[in-house]
Amino acid sequence: MKKVKKEKVIGPVVPVSYNRSILAAFEKQAKGKTCPLCNIKFSLASYRSHMNVCKVADDDDEIKVMASYTREEAILLRAGPEIVLGEENSGQEIPVNPKKKRRTGEEQLESTPNPPVVQAFDFDVPGPSTSSENLDPPSESSEVRSVEKEIKKSPVWENRRRSTRLAQNSQKSQSESQEAIVKKETATVLEVLASINNFETRIANSDRPTPYYVKCTVKILKKIISTMKSDGDFYADNFWLPSDIITFYRFVECLSDGAKCLLVRLFVRKPNWYHLEKLEQKYTEILNIRGAAVELMKWEFISDDSTLKTLNEALRISDITVLKNVAKKFKIDGNKNRQDLVQSLRKFALSQQSIFGGTGSVELAVLKSLKTELGTCIKIKDEMVDLFKCLFTLYCPVTTNSANVIDNPASTNVYQDLLYMMLSVENGSVEFPAPNPCPNIASFYKNRAMLMEYVTAKALESSLVLQMSNGDHDIALDLAIDAKEFLDQMPLEQKKYYESLEIHERKFTSIWVHTRCCGHATSVLEKQKKYGMAVEWQKDLLITNKDVQSCCLDSRGMWWDRMLLNLDSHLKVSVFPSYSQTKKRFFQEKTECAKMIQIALTDSSILEKELLSIQDRALKLKEMPPDFRPPLNIGTPMKRVITARTISKSLGDGRVNRFVFRDEEKEEDVECSVEEAARRWYIENDEFTTGVHDEGATWHTLFGLLFYDIIFCTDAVMASVWHSEVQDCPSDLSNTLYLKRKEKFEERFEWLKDADQETIEDNIRRIWGMKQNETNRECSWKHFQSGIEDCVSIFQCIPRPAMLSIFRRLAENYRNSRSGFPDLTLWNPEKKTVAVIEVKGPGDRLSTKQRLWLSFFADNGIKAEVCHVEAQNSRLLV
């Protein structure tokens, strides 16, 4: 049977209501909607995205949850008029004017110096539309009509207390709300000082102790912005950027105590990424560390892991557990150590191709997996690190000097050391010779740019030294090249200003540090055996570049010595086909070395120890002119050879000689140093009864006691050498020590020459009693086991003329003669004899500094010897 196709019946056309027509939609789109917060009109297309940005501030105390609803109810509310869901609040009466009035942002800052921490500040909850032009709902079901009918009868919507996020207020209340919820974006130094005073008052009246590192950081900030510089000005608003001042204000005023603690902890550590969970375990004094992290992110002090965008950074902070979990996900062998796992994941991310042929998506997938396994990670922002480094540098440039890392590799964190020293001074466990409180401040930075350049230069040098110690010579050389480019691009006026500063101030400038970085470059090139390039860098520092010849005066002699060594020995002569050509080239190199020696001898900045080394090289060089006369004339020191017992067995630490002596009381052999073995030999076999291994500490202590008021003078004339309370010496305890105190030194030398023995001894006892608990650069109290009596007894054994000559050499050229003293100082109080002994073990040789001091002691009538200790093997290990 054939099927009959039914005809489609078309009914009458029903007109569409205007509210659901396309014209209404265009009209509504053209009208747009007005933001209830900023009172700006937006199109419907951009209104939703704008509301995601223009949301209620985190400190708004007028937000109140009026109702909760499901996803379906939210859809209906967006499509309908202004409605309030639920009947449970229909009978409640909510006053239109609440008792608690809104206060302006200024009033809040005055009354609440520490606003509460907001744990979460994402108020992206969709609310009912406030527009009266909403489209009709798509369907007119009975359920929807009943809900709408019930809600319209409720009077709560009209009388309720409305949130600024949900409804429009009057123009006046709207402006007040915006003042309350918008973060303070500007501040002045006076406001920062007021906040600091409020902070100090609050912690003084609080029962809960504030961590020392927070109090010390605030103390540093207060001194920087409130202490007058030497020119009568302050580090005020015209010195700092507006962003710097608002950062200071937010740190003191807006951050909670926990957030302050976390920020300072992150600052004194390396600026790396850190696991929040590990920080929570490490810093138990921070009660709510997660809330503190949220607060610091809100005020833009730190970054969260959303900015962790490189695979190398993620791999660097991942522990072995995280790496194994990620390796398992990508089916990589996880039975490896951490270093091998890092290499495997990096190789996998860079070698595997995605379906589109690239490796980027695979790398992103590995990075995403690492971030998932790591959890929450935070990092202090680089601009915050630089800003706080500026504060610490201004407070104490001596302690925060990057040269401390070179001289003492254990000082890896100078900023943490500074905070700890401030704590020690505050609780009285350590005393320093600096005035406390110190009324002075470093005043040689004309503007913020100069200060920031110096801070950046210190960071560059620290990185360069770290790369050198790790053996990454190529990276270290790149950093040195950056320093060289900075010097070449520095304006001439700025170079002249730096040259006008005194030496003890000039060493805290960027030009000084970058010049020192160029000196590091020569060491890097020598380690790479690129002696030709090293010579070119050294010539530039010493001869060609006139702008840096007033910098790093202490290092110029060393650079000269290394350059001459490279020219004389290390620089290989190219082999030419002809022997005569090779010989000619060799002669040219030696002639160049002789020429450089003559130029070096005219450099007044060369210290005696390098001058002696250059003189030794000149005497060996045949190409020197026949009329050459050595500038120094030193004799050969007396030598003595002794034997001491050593252990013949190796204990596995690489030491060849282990000296021992017999302890008769315990009847056992005791290990000792070669200096101790020599000291015991002299006391047992020579005329001396007392001796110490001090390497000059005894002589420095006597010098410090007799000239204490001159060296550590704190009057107004010497104000520029004291910058903070934690200095253990004036900043000019170097080349310019004598020049700034010449008259006082000469008066003291005349007094020591004519004063009787008892008067000088009484003066030594008086200074010892006053300063024996003080930590300073000159006096080493621990080397005198019997205290002041040992110190007086050795003073009685030193001939007066010899003592004056030794102390004059120290005073007039402190930087050149502060080191190199012989190892042992021996004396006999009964016979009034004294001697200095330089001890050398098997294979050791004298340095130029030691040769100079031995010659100087001998020339002034003090017994000076070189004691060579030979090993006498013992087969018994007791």
From Swiss-Prot:
Positions with a binding annotation for Mn(2+) 1: 823, 838-839
Compositionally biased tracts (Low complexity): 168-179
Catalytic activity reported: Hydrolytically removes 5'-nucleotides successively from the 3'-hydroxy termini of 3'-hydroxy-terminated oligonucleotides
CC cofactor note: Binds 2 magnesium or manganese ions per subunit.
InterPro entries xref list: Fan1-like (IPR033315), FAN1-like_euk (IPR049132), FAN1-like_TPR (IPR049126), FAN1-like_WH (IPR049125), Rad18_UBZ4 (IPR006642), tRNA_endonuc-like_dom_sf (IPR011856), VRR_NUC (IPR014883)
Catalytic activity, EC: 3.1.4.1
Localization terms from the record: Nucleus
UniProt record similarity statement: Belongs to the FAN1 family.
Name by which UniProt lists this protein: Fanconi-associated nuclease 1 homolog
